[in-house]
Amino acid sequence: MVLELVAMELKVWVDGIQRVVCGVSEQTTCQEVVIALAQAIGQTGRFVLVQRLREKERQLLPQECPVGAQATCGQFANDVQFVLRRTGPSLSGRPSSDNCPPPERCPVRASLPPKPSAIPGREPRKALTFNLRCPKLVPSPSIPEPAALVGPIPDGFADLQDLELRIQRNTEELGHEAFWEQELQREQAREREGQARLQALSAATAEHAARLEALDAQACALEAELRLAAEAPGPPSATASAAERLRQDLATQERHSLEMQGTLALVSQALEAAEHALQAQAQELEELNRELRQCNLQQFIQQTGAALPPPPPQLDRTIPSTQDLLSPNRGELQGVPQSHILVSSLSPEVPPMRQSSWR
């Protein structure tokens, strides 16, 4: 049940139903609001009004003013909520009002609406509005209002509620204290880890600084040596002599390469000349084979006695030339068996007679 101050009105959630109490002022006590709400819902028992701000709750005292308690919250006054809770049965041991008819409406209850009957399947009840002001109405003399509903709450009950509220507050504070102790332990662990990492980084920084100093000293020493070497020329170092030897070797290799290129050019020229000579010899050999076949054909024709047509003038001229050519080259062609192969392949009809003519 939630209460909210809007134009001197309090919005209350009673068992999941929002109700509005009108005519509330700064002098209206919590006890009056609770009695009015209990009479409106037609229930008896012990009720408490709880002030809720976000997730924190505080039980209001009977003589405390809800409007004043809400005003003390300042800018969070609109977020204040009041919850009406039933803590137990009535002290007088009066049976529940559900089993007996409700009392007649008195001047206090005259402004309150009657309790709605529970109808199955009906929609949830809307917010109900009632007024704490007492209109000038004559109460019904038939059934008087029970004194338990309008009587003040005993001081012992108020003290008990105060003690319960203190216990609840102490429990919440203990819970918060345990939470903050855990957070403190976590922060201390994080701080220790951060200090360890800081120490490691400091050690690494010192080590790198020492290495940088050593490298700077080494660089200064090398620069001094270079300056001394540049100012005082001395005997050539091993590097210079090695470079000179490499230059000489390169020059020698270049000369050898030039000589090899010249030799290769001469060899290529000789190869070309040999190729030309071989081609000329092959042509000459073909001409000799052709002339030899002509001679063999003439000899065969003469032996068989056939009339040989007069040779052309070119053939007469070529025969002496072939004989002249054969006479100096006969010694060169003695070991070559190609002439017989060429002569035997002259014609397919002539070979048997040619063999007889050679015999």
Curated annotation (Swiss-Prot):
Residue ranges of the region described as Disordered: 87-123, 339-359
Keyword Transmembrane: no
Coiled coil residues, start to end: 180-208, 242-301
Residue intervals of the Ras-associating domain: 6-89
Pfam family, one: RA
SMART domains documented for this protein: RA
Signal peptide bounds: none
Single GO BP term: apoptotic process
InterPro entries given in the database record: N-RASSF, RA_dom, RASSF7_RA, Ubiquitin-like_domsf
Start-end of Polar residues biased regions: 89-99
Gene3D superfamilies (alphabetical): Phosphatidylinositol 3-kinase Catalytic Subunit, Chain A, domain 1 (3.10.20.90)
Function: Negatively regulates stress-induced JNK activation and apoptosis by promoting MAP2K7 phosphorylation and inhibiting its ability to activate JNK. Following prolonged stress, anti-apoptotic effect stops because of degradation of RASSF7 protein via the ubiquitin-proteasome pathway. Required for the activation of AURKB and chromosomal congression during mitosis where it stimulates microtubule polymerization.
The protein's name in its UniProt record: Ras association domain-containing protein 7
Organism: Mus musculus (Mouse)
Gene name of the encoded protein: Rassf7
